Design a protein with these regions (language model features):
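A nucleotide-sugar donor-handling region in carbohydrate enzymes
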Residues: 23-38, 185-288, 435
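C-terminal amphipathic helix plus adjacent low-complexity
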Residues: 12, 275-280, 411-469
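Active-site and donor-binding regions of nucleotide-sugar-utilizing enzymes
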Residues: 38-42, 54-66, 79-227, 369
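A conserved nucleotide-sugar
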Residues: 298-314
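N-terminal subdomain of nucleotide-sugar transferases
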Residues: 2-90
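Donor nucleotide-activated moiety binding/catalytic core segment of transferases
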Residues: 121, 282-285, 289-291, 316-370, ...
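Catalytic binding pocket for nucleotide-activated donors in carbohydrate/polymer assembly enzymes
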Residues: 327-336, 340, 367-443
Length: 469
């Protein structure tokens, strides 16, 4: 195994010598093709009439690459290789500090050197790899910045498939606005967003012109909407009743973050219209709420062996140091869940399949709340009264829509609501209507399907770029 301390100096040497062919070979080895069956291959097919997308930072797309692979040849790579190429130019890794550095400064010189290097490298890269456009999911990552900027210089358009569409409460809206202002102008040809709220934030920040931003919904929601329209087929399946808790950790931003007396950057620039200082004082009851939620689930699983209880974390959560709080919660519950045949932790389960197969869904600041609501599932929000009475509740996604869900006041009420909703899953018509409106506020799915609209936009951008050349 090659040691990191040997690899880094070698890479720096290759970059300094502009050994582009060797660097190309190293980067090419990290690029995979997403097949239309969802598999990845290090062997790339020929375009065969399909336009080719090169997706940067591929781990952040979730199901989007699978959807795009139906209509495009999709090549993708993680941030690792672009990071190799760029990190040696910088002493710190907040790209905004270099973008906005004054002319003549060391930081500006480093920024220009990195940009010039990447432009020359990509000239070689694109001469050997057929690519029609580059996509990203955000504009804030240093690893992506020079790649997309230099791609445009090499006549390869950059299209951002912006994924942070859950701009539900004021602080998230403000943070997206503030970040866009700090970055200045969008480095690319087009932005596709999930909803009108995102588009308006970018317009207000003068990040991009109206003609450069399209609202097209979310690719991964096409299958959900299709399944909802055929939901009668799923209801016929007989099985044990199932309760699913979509996992959250106690240090999630909805509970606030301790700033330790330092005035947060968010309060210093492009002044917010509201006082956001509450968000930088973490709610003291967050651990108790977290432990109570898991104690309630564990005790119900112990008592009701004919009901399945699922904990659904993201896979990265299980690997995170934050997972120790889950272990502590189970220890505090006094229940040995490893001995329960009806208690499961499912980090790799398909989210939509899990929602459809569940009788009751429990979640917090997650899009699964409105996804489950659209399907017609009872959704329980364990936003206990003490949290609702705190200032940090301002950052709870669904604080203005509690009437569309079941809201638990404490752990005992949480247990009661789960059992009640297992027996009675009725959703009143007016609540169904409100839930549907809420879902389409954040996922503005076109009637023809998001994939058709994305395909049309991407094709138009690529063709218009060719016409300019």
């Amino acid at each position: 195994m090659i040691k990191t301390y040997l690899v880094i100096p070698f890479l720096k040497y290759l970059i300094r010598k502009e050994a582009f062919l060797i660097l190309f070979s190293l980067v090419r080895a990290t690029i995979k093709e997403r097949r239309n069956d969802g598999s990845d291959s290090i062997f790339h097919s020929k375009p065969d009439g399909k336009k080719t997308i090169l997706a940067l930072d591929s781990l952040r797309y979730r199901g989007d690459l699978d959807a795009l692979s139906q209509n495009f040849r999709v090549l993708h790579l993680t941030q690792r290789a672009p990071g190799w190429l760029i990190k040696g130019f910088y002493h710190e890794f907040d790209i905004v500090n270099y973008i906005n550095a004054p002319d003549g400064s060391d930081k500006k010189a480093q920024y220009i050197a990195a940009s010039n290097f990447m432009t020359k490298f990509l000239r070689v890269f694109y001469s050997k790899v057929s690519v029609d456009c580059v996509t990203t999911v955000n504009f804030r990552y240093t690893e992506d910045h020079h790649w997309v900027k230099s791609s445009e210089k090499n006549s390869i358009p950059h299209i951002m498939l912006y994924r942070e569409g859950m701009v539900v409460y004021y602080r998230t809206e403000y943070e997206v606005f503030r970040r866009a202002k700090r970055f200045g102008k969008f480095l690319g040809s087009h932005i596709i967003v999930h909803n009108v709220k995102c588009k308006n934030i970018f317009l207000d920040a003068k990040f991009a012109s109206k003609s450069k931003i399209s609202v097209a919904g979310a690719l991964r929601m096409d299958s959900l909407v299709s399944k909802v329209n055929n939901y009668h087929k799923y209801k016929k399946i007989k099985r044990n009743k199932k309760v699913t808790l979509f996992y959250f950790h106690p240090n999630t931003p909805m509970f606030g973050v301790d700033a330790k007396g330092v005035t947060p950057k968010a309060l210093l620039s492009h002044g917010p219209k509201k006082d956001l200082s509450y968000a930088f004082n973490a709610w003291s009851g967050r651990f108790d709420l977290f432990y109570d939620v898991h104690e309630a689930i564990a005790k119900l699983a112990y008592k009701y062996r004919d009901i399945d209880f699922i904990i659904k974390p993201k896979d990265i959560m299980v690997a995170s140091p934050q997972w120790k709080y889950y272990d502590k919660a189970i220890e505090k519950s006094g229940i040995n869940v490893s001995n329960l045949e009806n208690y499961f932790i499912e980090p790799y389960a398909n989210v939509h399949d899990l929602i459809f197969s569940s009788d009751v869904v429990c979640a917090m600041n997650s899009s699964v709340v409105i996804e489950s609501a659209l399907i017609g599932k009872p959704v329980i929000l364990p936003v206990f009264k003490e949290y609702r009475d705190s200032k940090n509740f301002e950052d709870f996604h669904w604080k203005d829509d509690l009437d569309l869900f079941d809201v638990a006041d404490d752990k005992h009420d949480f247990e009661r609501l789960i059992l009640q909703r297992l027996d009675d899953d009725d959703i009143p018509k007016e609540v169904e209507k409100g839930r549907k409106e809420l879902f389409y506020t954040y996922f503005d799915q076109p009637k023809e399907g998001a994939i058709d609209k994305y395909t049309s936009i991407i094709n138009d951008v690529v063709e218009s770029y060719k016409n300019i050349d």
